[in-house]
């Protein structure tokens, strides 16, 4: 399979290890982290929430190990879509590629919509769709200049988020153990909220149900694979970035959950608008709500920035594989696939539908479209690594020649594949998440049909012409 393009249509390898790490964090630390943690604590209880995030982190760890082997062996911009086409089947690669592209393009729309709603706190008289247009234009410019401009902007977006999270963990932890006085002279809670109503107040089953939400919270870390095609020295930068992303993401998430669960009673955690705001207000930090509104706004734009980059590169790679219009596989003089960027942004501008419909209605429809793609992506990564290793050994390849090896093969990849599949199946048992299956499954079936009716026949005809 041809993964290289003509000299005039190539991406540029300008990303360093720090860029890859921040791009991955940019995709994962969003509203699900800043707003969704309270729901997890409320449902699973304090200890149950911590355990849920540890298990979710373990699934992320297994998936990223599989991605590391593939991305080092094949550092291409198509990443797991290219791997799926080559090692699973062209039909699956086609269907998954379009699902994953649509998922991230729609995620951009969701982030623009959420950002517009946040701006109404400060500018209530300006319509949401106007802010959507402003933020869409900003993200388009950052992605259109150069790949390095995108990477640098994402580096600083993610840096702001990390700084706030570190301050939250330090200040919240200090207040939790009485090192900082609480507002109103309240006593430090220490660890009382973890055991005052029992270790699992809603039972083990409640903790298992929250795994669906928790696993989605970690998704976005796989963007390292998409950026591999534009990274300097991928054999060194990708393994380093994967290790940094896995451990630092897990530490940020788990320590934040411990602080929130320690500071806020679990019954109240799902009621407050943002648990981060509630903790900052307990400590007595002025303008806590406005500060977090700004941080969440940055988080939204960061996710949109990473998502626009990822979906553009997936579409670009598919075009060069004959799975999308050929023009989408071209880059400009700066190495930016502009046509793919324009098409992706056109889908992301679905957020502008808020001019004609209620913002909440548009949000739910877009969220259902985006819901399944990332989970299918993790399954695809695990399965592609298993199929790649089998083919590699069958064709006489030596394991010691692989620059990055998934340890304990095939045990860890199979565990990752199984756990990711269980999470996907679990969507059917959650009424709020079930709509993701209703949208995602028919979409993939339609893509399969299109591949066999149109794409496969066209590729066969092209091969015959070449002969």
Swiss-Prot record:
Compartmental location: Cell membrane
InterPro entries from the UniProt entry: AA-permease/SLC12A_dom, Amino_acid_permease_CS
Keywords (A to Z) from UniProt: Amino-acid transport, Arginine metabolism, Cell membrane, Membrane, Transmembrane, Transmembrane helix, Transport
Organism: Bacillus subtilis (strain 168)
GO annotation, cellular component aspect: membrane; plasma membrane
Induction of its expression: Part of the rocDEF operon. Expression is sigma L dependent, induced by arginine, ornithine or proline.
Similarity field: Belongs to the amino acid-polyamine-organocation (APC) superfamily. Amino acid transporter (AAT) (TC 2.A.3.1) family.
GO molecular function: amino acid transmembrane transporter activity
Transmembrane domains' residue ranges: 21-41, 47-67, 87-107, 122-142, 162-182, 207-227, 246-266, 283-303, 336-356, 361-381, 409-429, 435-455
BP terms from Gene Ontology: amino acid transmembrane transport; arginine metabolic process
Main location: membrane
Domain of life: Bacteria
Protein topology in the membrane: Multi-pass membrane protein
Family annotation (Pfam families): AA_permease (PF00324)
Record function comment: Putative transport protein involved in arginine degradative pathway. Probably transports arginine or ornithine.
Record protein name field: Amino-acid permease RocE
Phylogenetic lineage: Bacteria, Bacillati, Bacillota, Bacilli, Bacillales
């Amino acid at each position: 399979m041809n993964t290289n393009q003509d000299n005039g249509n190539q991406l540029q390898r300008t990303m360093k290890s720090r860029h890859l790490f921040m791009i991955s964090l940019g995709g994962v630390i969003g509203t699900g982290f800043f707003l969704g943690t309270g729901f997890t604590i409320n449902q699973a209880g304090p200890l149950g929430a911590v355990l849920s995030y540890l298990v979710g982190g373990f699934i992320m760890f297994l998936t990223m190990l599989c991605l590391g082997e593939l991305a080092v062996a094949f550092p291409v911009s198509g990443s797991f879509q290219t791997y799926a086409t080559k090692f699973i089947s062209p039909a699956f690669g086609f269907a998954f590629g379009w699902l994953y592209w649509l998922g991230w393009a729609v995620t951009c729309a969701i982030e623009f919509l959420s950002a517009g709603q946040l701006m109404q706190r400060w500018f209530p008289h300006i319509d949401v769709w106007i802010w959507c247009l402003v933020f869409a234009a900003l993200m388009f410019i950052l992605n259109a200049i150069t790949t390095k401009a995108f990477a640098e902007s994402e580096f600083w977006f993610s840096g702001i988020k990390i700084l706030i999270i570190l301050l939250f963990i330090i200040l919240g932890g200090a207040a939790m153990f009485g090192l900082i006085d609480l507002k109103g002279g309240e006593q430090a809670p220490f660890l009382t909220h973890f055991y005052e109503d029992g270790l699992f107040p809603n039972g083990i089953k409640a903790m298992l149900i929250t795994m669906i939400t928790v696993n989605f919270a970690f998704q976005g870390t796989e963007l390292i694979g998409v950026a591999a095609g534009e990274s300097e020295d991928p054999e060194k930068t990708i393994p380093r970035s994967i290790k940094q992303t896995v451990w630092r993401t897990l530490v940020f998430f788990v320590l934040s959950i411990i602080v929130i669960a320690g500071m806020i009673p679990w019954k109240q955690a799902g009621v407050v608008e943002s648990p981060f705001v509630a903790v900052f207000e307990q400590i007595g930090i002025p303008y806590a709500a406005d500060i977090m509104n700004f941080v969440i706004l940055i988080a939204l734009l960061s996710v949109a920035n990473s998502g626009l980059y990822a979906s553009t590169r997936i579409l670009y790679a598919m075009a060069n594989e004959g799975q999308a219009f050929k023009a989408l596989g071209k880059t400009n003089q700066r190495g930016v696939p502009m046509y793919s960027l324009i098409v992706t942004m056109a889908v992301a501008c679905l957020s502008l539908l808020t001019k004609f419909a209620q913002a909440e209605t548009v949000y739910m429809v877009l969220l259902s479209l985006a819901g399944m793609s990332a989970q299918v992506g993790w399954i695809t990564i695990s399965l592609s690594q298993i199929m790649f290793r089998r083919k590699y050994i069958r064709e006489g390849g030596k394991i010691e020649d692989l620059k990055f090896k998934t340890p304990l093969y095939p045990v860890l990849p199979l565990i990752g594949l199984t756990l990711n599949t269980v999470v996907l199946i679990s969507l059917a048992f959650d009424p709020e998440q079930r709509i993701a299956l209703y949208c995602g499954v028919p979409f993939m079936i339609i893509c399969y049909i299109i591949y066999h009716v149109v794409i496969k026949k066209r590729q066969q005809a092209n091969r015959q012409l070449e002969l």
